[in-house]
Structure formats: structure tokens, C-alpha cells
Amino acid sequence: MTDPIADPVVPDTLAEPRLVVEPGVAARFAAVAEPVLQAMGYRLVRIKVSGEAGCTVQIMAERPDGTMLIDDCEAVSRALSPVLDVTDPIDRAYRLEISSPGIDRPLVRSSDFARYSGHLVKIEMAVPHQGRKRYRGLLDGVEGDAIRIQREGVTKDEDPLVLLPMHDIGDARLVLTDELVAESMRRGKQAERELKQSLGLAPPPPPHAKRSDPKKSSAPKPKPLTKPVVKPDAKPKPKNTKQHRLAADRLRRGDTDLSEGD
């Protein structure tokens, strides 16, 4: 069977730079893997090198719509393995793993934050922002070079909305929720259906069918977390009914010192 190739996309989408890049050995693997992935229509998400004796190199990749099927992983492995054998980025034996980013995936590009707006995220800043390094809350989209977060667990004196500069983010990933699992399943089924159609294993979609927009999330738009507003009563209640009655009696008697006798 022909290896799956991701759908043709605008080159700028594949070449969009990552906000967080790996240092050291992982960076050498990234330099080799990224051009191969882009040529196949995939994007590099993250590379992790773990273990000393039994070294494992995990390469996370995805289609531009955020999906990655088993067939995709196998195709990438077959294309990338011989290239890595020639370039030899590491001086010891290792085991290569090609995987999808997973449901609670890392967010590594500006488009990731836009796509998963409305989902719960946790952020660790490389540079502290407003005296904090860790944030958790609803992702509320992108604003220029920053992301908007509706923070969880804020006090009544704190503003829940915070803007975090993207270039200061050290790590960002989705938090596993029921809504995220449901959307991930929807995306996976859509990608599998489109793959079968492209390989001729399933009938093509009807002409009027609309393709899902990979840049958009089906998650509900986050509602702004506003501070509680205390509304005044329609009719002010007397603070001391007895005091008011005594004051009224003194007024009727012509007394000028209304505090006398309280």
C-alpha cells in the first residue's frame, strides 16, 4: 500500500517556527528530522531523548490539522530512519519512536494556541511573568505575540485574564478533559476517513460536503471570568429602626441635636 502523505498545504503552515526548541542532542535530531517531515507534509512537534544505556529518541509529529494516524507514524519512520543512519546525530545505539503529540499534547506554535482556544491549558514560563512562572486556566486565543489565559482559582481582587508573551513560554500543554477527549476523537475519525478516501478505500465525500477547518476548535468559546458584582438593594434597609423612631420624635419636638438619647 502506498505510504500516506499529508494533504497539500500552504508552505508557510509547514514552515511555521516552533516557540520552544530542544537543546543539545535533541536539537541535532531536529535539524535532520524537520526537513524530512516538511517534505512529506508533516510538522515536527517535539523531540525527546531519554535513557543512557537504552537510549530512546521520541519524535512527535503531526499533520497540519493536528492529527497523526498509525499509518502516518509508520510512513515517517520508514522515510526518516535511513536519513538518520547516514547523518548519525548521536554516537551510540538508540531506539527510534515516531508518535503523535497525544491528546494532552504540547503547544509549540502560535497556531496551536489559536486552534485549541477554549480548552484548559497549563503553562510554565521560561521567564517569570508578574512574579509567577506557572499558569493554569482556559486558553482564550492569541493577541499579537501573546496568548490570553482565563486563570483558575483567582481571588476576588485579581483579574482572571492574563496575557503571556509567547517568546517567554518554556512549556505549554493541554490538560486532559472530557471536552478535549471528545474533540480529539472527532479529529481522529475525520483524518482516518479522509485518508481512506485519498487511498481509494472509501467513497469520496459528496460535492456539497464541507471539510472541517483544522485551524478551528469545536470547544466552546471561553466565557470571561469576571469579578463578582454586588448589586445594591432596590430599597435601602434601615440600619437601626429604633434610632430612626427616636430621631423622628425629637424632630417633631423641635430638638436640633438628633444624636441625643441614642
Curated annotation (Swiss-Prot):
Q: Where does it localize?
A: Cytoplasm
- Region Disordered: list its residue ranges: 185-262
Q: Which UniProt keywords apply?
A: Cytoplasm, Ribosome biogenesis
**Matching InterPro entries:** Ribosome_maturation_RimP, RimP_C, RimP_C_sf, RimP_N, RimP_N_sf
Please indicate which superkingdom the organism of origin belongs to. Answer: Bacteria
Q: Mind telling me which CDD domains this protein's record contains?
A: YlxS_C
**What does it do?**
Required for maturation of 30S ribosomal subunits.
How is this protein named in the record? Ribosome maturation factor RimP
Protein's organism: Rhodopseudomonas palustris (strain BisB5)
